[in-house]
Every structure is written in C-alpha cells, then in structure tokens.
Amino acid sequence: MGKEKIHINIVVIGHVDSGKSTTTGHLIYKCGGIDKRTIEKFEKEAAEMGKGSFKYAWVLDKLKAERERGITIDISLWKFETGKYYITIIDAPGHRDFIKNMITGTSQADCAVLIVAGGVGEFEAGISKNGQTREHALLAFTLGVKQLIIGVNKMDSTEPPFSQKRFEEITKEVSAYIKKIGYNPATVPFVPISGWHGDNMLEASTNMPWFKGWKIERKEGNASGITLLEALDCIIPPQRPTNKPLRLPLQDVYKIGGIGTVPVGRVETGVLKPGMIVTFAPSNVTTEVKSVEMHHEALVEALPGDNVGFNVKNISVKDIRRGNVAGDSKNDPPMQAGSFTAQVIILNHPGQISAGYAPVLDCHTAHIACKFAELKQKIDRRSGKKLEDDPKFLKSGDAAIVEMIPGKPMCVETFSDYPPLGRFAVRDMRQTVAVGVIKGVDKKLASSGKVTKSAAKAGKK
C-alpha cells in the first residue's frame, strides 16, 4: 500500500448540456470506486431503456437520483484516483441545491473543473449572458475556489471534428472571461476532450495530433501535460486549517441511552480532543468533551474534514441544537453575532431588494432569517470598487456591501478568519437568490451562560 494518497475535493461546473455528467461519469467509471458489477447493471439498464449512448452520464444519473431521494449512497461512488490523489467530486451541478451546497457545502472544493462544450453553437449558448458557465465560474471564485481546470468538451462534434481552430477560439474567449472574474489564465490548464469517446481524458488522443499539451505557470511550480487526468494530478493540495482555533458547526444533536448527549458535526478548523472544554455559540453553554468518535471508533483527536460525534457532560439535548458552533473555550471561543457586514452578489431575484428584506440565510449548518438592515454601498463585483453609497435597492447582477441582523441568535465568522463559517446562501422562493461572504462581525457579549460543573472544575486545573 505505501503511504496513503492525499484527498482532494473538486466541484464540476458548466452549462447544462456541456457534458459534465458524461465527463465526470467517465472518470469515475475508468478510475473510480464503482465496481464492475454495478457498472454492468447500469449498462444493461441503459441499453434496455435505449440510452446506450448515454452510459457514462447514466452512471452519474443513477448516483444523483439516489442522492436526491436521500439514500446515503456509498460515497466511494463519487471518488476516483489519479497518480497522486484520491479525488472526491463534492457536487455536480444540475442538482437542485447545487448553489446552496456549494456554499454551505459539506466541504470546500480545492479545485473547480469547468466543462465547456465545443460543439457548434453550444459554447456560445453556455457563455451567453444568461448561460450558467459564467455564474458557476463567478461563484467558484467568490467562494474561494482558487484553482481551475478547463475541459473543452465534445471536440468530436466541432466543425470539422477535432478542430484546432475551434479549440483555440474557445480557449481565447474563456481566458478573457475568467480573467475578468479574477483567475489568472496562465495558471489554468485548457484540455480539449471528448468525455464520451475518451479523447485526452486518461490518455492522449490520436485524433488531435496538433495538440501539444497544456502548460501552466504558477509560483508553486510550473506543470505541463496532455490529459485531463494529468491536469487533476497537478492540483496543489490544500493546507488543512489545523492550526486555527476549533470551529465545529453542529449538524445534529442525539440523545443516546447510557451515554448521554452526543452532538454531531464536521470539524471545519482546529482540532477537537477528549478532555477539551468547549463552548457552544450562540447557546453560550460550556462543558467538557468526554470522548470523540468517528465511524464508531474512538479518536484521540479529530481534524478538519472529520465528521464526528462527541459526548458532552451534563448537557441536555435542549441546551444545544443544529446550527450551533462548538469551539475551544480557552482559544477564541465562538460567540453570537449581533450583526455582520457582508459582500453579497444578487443572482436571481425577480424584483428589487431594499433595506428591511428578511430572507433565510444558510450559513454552515445554520438556517436562520436575517434582515438586510442597511444597504451600505453598491460595488463592482469583479474589482470590489465602490460604485455608489447607500443604494435604494439591489437587483439581479448587483454586488453590494450590506449590514445584516439575524432574526434569531446565530454564530457566524468572517470569511478571512474561518472561511466555512463566513460564506452563505440567501434563500427565498425556494431558490438561491444571492450569495455572500462575511467581511466583519459585531460579536455580542452574551450574559454569563451555562457552565457545567465538570467544565468549571477542569477550567481551574
């Protein structure tokens, strides 16, 4: 076995018909966690339904359908391997809640793979004013996904097939576009592929002898290659934030007979250890952690990315709930936010948003109505430069700095200190109407909260 490979998370983005599913399905299929039996079953079903030409996407559709129905499918199905990494696809758009998931997402993507269709007229549709290509790429950048790979797909259906001219034309236009958003095209590999036929996916295509490979330049080291798989292998692995203070948003709180209260959640930053004195915000409850478990095994420490359950002393299920955040009581403990300032981008709101608007915010695991108390300034969404002070209203496409006040106690952090607790989705009318990143938090000094005896005792040590 040797040393285990590093885990990397990617998000696959692009317009509806760009071939994301087929491309992703192909990778999972060829390098992934799907066993032969499942694949044969899928192929048979696809053929029976006359969808033989659709088999890679079919793999993904089956997985998606199961995800949508809430069946926890074996997450290994969304994984595949490169020479250096285990890669998990943390979300595939087309999924209704894609934007919300990308923000509150179970995890931050280390890299976005943008698939654009090279077919006649297809590329133009995707990148047009209302195409999703732009929105997805802008979202990825706004939410801190700083690495990007571009697959120019469906090279088999260009005019003529596998056209060098078409690839170069698309590369030029997409480069200009991503540059406007904030990416540096010199660091982005552009790979001409066919997700269906497999050209330049895992091995170099014989159909494009003109393609001499992609090259990228970056301060962490230059890289070059030919295939999409090689480009994925050149992702720079993330620095996991173990050195920051602990932040663990609660997903659920269970009461387990004979054990007691067990909060469950994902460590976003820092380290959680048995014996630690943790404070929950905004409940303002402090107690000792008795034990920490993952997959029914006791841990000596839980690190960022770990989904854990931990047992806390003398606290009832009524004291803490989903959306609370646990942190180290002695190291920048989490606190309730009285109000916060955020930079928001309005994605799709049919009308005008003015001060007083109070939609629901999804931030980490919290789901709470917040009021747009004050619209401070409208800004240019690319450069962040101020366009006007105190705008009367905001509409789709606008970016602004706003002051927000939670309707109920809530714990959030600035994006620069704790990224996963500093980005949010604004939900209204069953869709994501805006996204935001938090620039500043006005923390509320809560009155003295509940401190359990064991915590008080351990605190004196």
Swiss-Prot record:
The chain residues annotated with the modification N,N,N-trimethylglycine are 2
Report residue spans for region: G3: 91-94
Which GO biological-process labels does this protein carry? translation; translational elongation
Q: Where is the tr-type G domain?
A: 5-242
Localization (cell): Cytoplasm
Q: Which family does it belong to?
A: Belongs to the TRAFAC class translation factor GTPase superfamily. Classic translation factor GTPase family. EF-Tu/EF-1A subfamily.
Q: What is this protein called?
A: Elongation factor 1-alpha, oocyte form
